[in-house]
């Protein structure tokens, strides 16, 4: 208990209240020699974080679209809401990596700029799946551009980050693209055979139901 009180007292001692939610803490002088990420690589990583956040918001819009009472496709809604969470997790992983490398010492609010989703409605499940596939392809290209920027800098080839992005992100991207392409192909075949009923049946399949 005494340790907790001491910690609180120490925090109050260094915090000068500006408002009910803010305090000033004098910066400390820490050696910078361990911070080695180059500007081109750092900038690419920051842009990738925004790309992942944008993809997450787009998937949220897609999930909300298929949740509407007039559309009511819970399988598609779940697919896209899950994808939104996955993209948000990707952004968090990239932020964690920058923190580990000492690249986020000051205000980090510039990392996340909220922009309206590119689209807010889709004509069909096929339209949505093909849009998702196109979006994932663009995300993959963006990750590859980060890798190129981080491994081609003449001052510092960032092997560790390149290996992290290649193993942690690229493989998942390629598997995700293949999965979306397969889903779109299957749905088109079901529509050819069962007409509009095909999308209803496919939606149930997305929920794990037997059809």
Swiss-Prot record:
Residues 1-20 form the signal peptide. Induction: Up-regulated in midgut, fat body and hemolymph in response to bacteria E.coli or S.aureus infection. GO terms for biological process: intracellular iron ion homeostasis; iron ion transport. Disulfide bonds join 41-150. Residues 35-191 form the Ferritin-like diiron domain. It catalyses: 4 Fe(2+) + O2 + 4 H(+) = 4 Fe(3+) + 2 H2O. Its EC number is 1.16.3.1. GO terms for cellular component: extracellular region; Golgi apparatus. Fe cation 1 binds at residues 52, 87, 90. This is Ferritin heavy chain. It comes from Papilio xuthus.
């Amino acid at each position: 208990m005494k340790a907790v009180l001491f910690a609180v007292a120490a925090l109050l001692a260094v915090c000068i209240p500006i408002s009910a939610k803010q305090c000033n803490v004098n910066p400390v002088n820490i050696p910078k020699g361990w911070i080695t990420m180059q500007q081109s690589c750092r900038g690419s990583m920051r842009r990738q974080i925004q790309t992942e956040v944008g993809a997450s918001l787009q998937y949220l819009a897609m999930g909300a679209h298929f949740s509407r009472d007039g559309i009511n496709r819970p399988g598609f809604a779940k697919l896209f809401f899950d994808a939104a969470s996955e993209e948000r997790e990707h952004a968090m992983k990239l932020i964690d990596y920058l923190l580990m490398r000492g690249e986020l010492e000051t205000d980090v609010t510039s990392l996340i700029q909220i922009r309206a989703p590119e689209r807010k409605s889709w004509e069909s499940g096929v339209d949505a799946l093909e849009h998702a596939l196109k979006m994932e392809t663009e995300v993959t290209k963006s990750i590859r551009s980060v890798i190129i920027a981080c491994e081609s800098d003449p001052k510092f080839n960032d092997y560790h980050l390149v290996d992290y992005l290649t193993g942690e992100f690229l493989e998942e991207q390629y598997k995700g693209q293949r999965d979306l392409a397969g889903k779109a192909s299957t749905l088109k075949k079901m529509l050819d055979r069962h007409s509009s009923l095909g999308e209803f049946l496919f939606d149930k399949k997305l929920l794990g139901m037997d059809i």
